[in-house]
């Protein structure tokens, strides 16, 4: 029975020489050596042909897929499992690993087409073209817009379709993306789901994943509304139904847990304490005294003290980082970050104090950051890379200017840098492009000053 054998493979219980033969094929096809659980996951996927991988980030899901693809591609062309094309659907930010890891896995390049900045007509021409492109990378949005062309492509070619970050199709309410991918599924030779978070909202999230992987089978026997209720039901009977659900889906997925990765213990670097410069300390002390006076005067007004505490904290953080941030009135700053600016604080006196700050000194943190960067790059060599996290936009620009003055060029990554979209011109600098070039040593600079909210 197929399900039993798939489950046995999942549990590392394989019979005969099939697994050994699989390993031999991969050793001949791949230059990257898969570790034990990756090899088992690739074998499970190759056997099942249609399966999910719910492994955690960093477990090598891309390599696992390439391993399964390599084996299926090694079969005779007339074999019903043979594939020779990959259609990877995912967010644009997920494309780079597929491009880079192909060469790392196989030891050579191949024909890859990135469907970014490609209009509908050229997408159609690609899917109807007789020219062979081994790997096509396309976003969920573009695939939904080209559904008919994709179906024709899948009918004509022997394609493994991979949905990367497949939570995009979890919508069980008939969303356009979900329906487009589900209606294309029956025409793929092989179907793969990749996501590290298969059911964040409840068991109903699994429904479309398994409809895609096995469109002709009813892997999940429960209707969506039942799965929704099952997610919150804590009764004994519900627990039995959950066990049935897990038993039904378990032959068709693999999951490598974080504990399986044998990762080394993280290296903890204690924070560096940097003393403020003389002028910076004077401004800091002034702000602290100023707001203590406000607390005493306005303590009787309900809620006002808490607002003032927040305002004081913001100002002290700004000052401790870079007094130049104080050039912007507090009301403007609060409004910019979405906090009510009706605090009635008069900033005029402090504004006069800080206007000439840069004539007096450089923020002590900047000096320390520059030295840390120089130390890291000197240790790591030309491939050394440094990310400096920063919140305030003004601070990012000021730090970049200071680093430049110290011979350290850098790139900014924050909200003003556009995201990459399907119709983005190749000449436009985007967040994804900066990250790709930085990761793979194609960026002119090896320092990025980044706002975490822009890259998360």
Predicted stretch roles:
Residues 1-51, 110, 133-135, 139-142, ...:
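Charged, low-complexity
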Residues 49-68:
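Walker A/P-loop
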Residues 64, 69, 263-280, 303-448, ...:
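Conserved Helicase C-terminal RecA-like lobe
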Residues 94-118, 216:
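Conserved helix-turn-beta segment of the N-terminal RecA-like "Helicase ATP-binding" lobe
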């Amino acid at each position: 029975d197929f399900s039993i054998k798939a489950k046995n493979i999942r549990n590392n219980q394989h019979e005969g020489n099939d697994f050994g033969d699989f390993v031999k094929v991969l050793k001949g096809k791949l230059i990257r050596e898969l570790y034990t659980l990756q090899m088992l996951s690739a074998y499970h996927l190759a056997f099942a042909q249609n399966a999910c991988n719910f492994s955690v980030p960093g477990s090598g899901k891309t390599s696992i897929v390439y391993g399964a693809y390599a084996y299926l591609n090694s079969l005779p062309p007339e074999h019903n499992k043979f594939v020779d094309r990959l259609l990877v659907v995912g967010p644009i930010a997920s494309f780079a690993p597929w491009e880079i890891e192909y060469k790392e896995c196989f030891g050579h390049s191949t024909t890859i087409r990135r469907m970014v900045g490609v209009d509908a007509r050229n997408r159609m021409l690609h899917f109807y073209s007789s020219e062979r492109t081994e790997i096509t990378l396309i976003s969920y949005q573009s695939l939904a817009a080209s559904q008919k062309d994709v179906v024709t492509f899948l009918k004509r070619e022997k394609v493994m379709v991979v949905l990367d970050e497949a939570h995009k199709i979890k919508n069980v309410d008939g969303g356009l993306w979900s329906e487009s991918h589900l209606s294309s599924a029956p025409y793929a030779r092989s179907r793969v789901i990749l996501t590290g978070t298969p059911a964040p909202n409840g068991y109903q999230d699994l429904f479309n994943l398994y409809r895609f992987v096995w469109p002709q089978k009813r892997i999940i026997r429960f209707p969506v509304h039942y799965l929704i209720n099952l997610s919150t039901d804590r009764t004994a009977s519900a627990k039995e139904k959950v066990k049935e659900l897990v038993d039904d889906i378990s032959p068709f997925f693999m999951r490598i847990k974080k504990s399986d990765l044998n990762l080394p213990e993280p290296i903890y670097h204690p924070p560096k304490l940097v003393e403020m410069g003389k002028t910076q300390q004077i401004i800091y002390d002034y702000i602290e005294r100023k707001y203590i006076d406000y607390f005493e005067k306005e303590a009787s007004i309900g809620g006002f003290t808490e607002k003032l505490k927040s305002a004081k904290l913001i100002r002290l953080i700004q000052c401790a980082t870079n007094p130049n941030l104080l050039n912007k009135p507090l009301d403007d700053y609060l409004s910019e970050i979405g906090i009510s600016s009706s605090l009635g604080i008069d900033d005029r006196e402090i504004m006069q104090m800080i206007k000439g700050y840069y004539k007096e000194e450089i923020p002590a943190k900047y000096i320390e950051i520059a030295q840390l960067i120089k130390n890291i790059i000197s240790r790591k060599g030309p491939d050394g890379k440094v990310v400096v996290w920063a919140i305030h936009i003004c601070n990012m620009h000021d730090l970049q200017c200071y680093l430049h003055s110290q011979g350290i060029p850098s790139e900014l990554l924050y909200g003003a840098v556009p995201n990459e979209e399907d119709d983005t011109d190749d000449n436009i600098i985007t967040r994804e492009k900066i990250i790709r070039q930085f990761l793979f040593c194609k960026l002119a600079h090896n320092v990025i000053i980044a706002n975490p909210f822009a890259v998360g």
